[in-house]
């Protein structure tokens, strides 16, 4: 699965890879 944009909390087609937002690390 792809990552959602960092400024989104989540999206139907991907996972939230930026739980701390755009300023946080990608997980």
Swiss-Prot record:
Keywords: Disulfide bond, Ion channel impairing toxin, Nematocyst, Neurotoxin, Secreted, Toxin, Voltage-gated sodium channel impairing toxin. Specific arthropod (crab and insect) toxin that inhibits inactivation of voltage-gated sodium channels. It competes well with the site-3 toxin LqhalphaIT (from the scorpion L.quinquestriatus (AC P17728)) on binding to cockroach neuronal membranes (Ki=21.4 nM), and inhibits the inactivation of D.melanogaster channel (DmNav1), but not that of mammalian Navs expressed in Xenopus oocytes. Its activity is synergically enhanced by ligands of receptor site-4 (Bj-xtrIT (AC P56637)). GO terms for cellular component: extracellular region; nematocyst. The lineage of its organism: Eukaryota, Metazoa, Cnidaria, Anthozoa, Hexacorallia. Negative results: is inactive on mammals, when tested by subcutaneous injection into mice at a high dose (up to 5940 nmol/kg of mouse). Does not inhibit rNav1.2/SCN2A, rNav1.4/SCN4A, hNav1.5/SCN5A and rNav1.6/SCN8A. Changing residue 19 to A: Low decrease in binding affinity to cockroach neuronal membranes and in toxicity to blowfly larvae. Changing residue 23 to A: Low increase in binding affinity to cockroach neuronal membranes and in toxicity to blowfly larvae. Changing residue 25 to A: Low increase in binding affinity to cockroach neuronal membranes and in toxicity to blowfly larvae. Changing residue 27 to A: No change in binding affinity to cockroach neuronal membranes and in toxicity to blowfly larvae. Disulfide bonds join 3-17, 4-11, 6-22. It comes from Anemonia sulcata. Changing residue 5 to A: Low decrease in binding affinity to cockroach neuronal membranes and in toxicity to blowfly larvae. One of its GO terms (molecular function) is toxin activity. Changing residue 12 to A: Loss of binding affinity to cockroach neuronal membranes and of toxicity to blowfly larvae. Pfam families: ATX_III. It is found in: Secreted; Nematocyst. Changing residue 16 to A: No change in binding affinity to cockroach neuronal membranes and in toxicity to blowfly larvae. This is Delta-actitoxin-Avd2a. Belongs to the sea anemone short toxin (type III) family. Changing residue 13 to A: Loss of binding affinity to cockroach neuronal membranes and of toxicity to blowfly larvae. It comes from the Eukaryota.
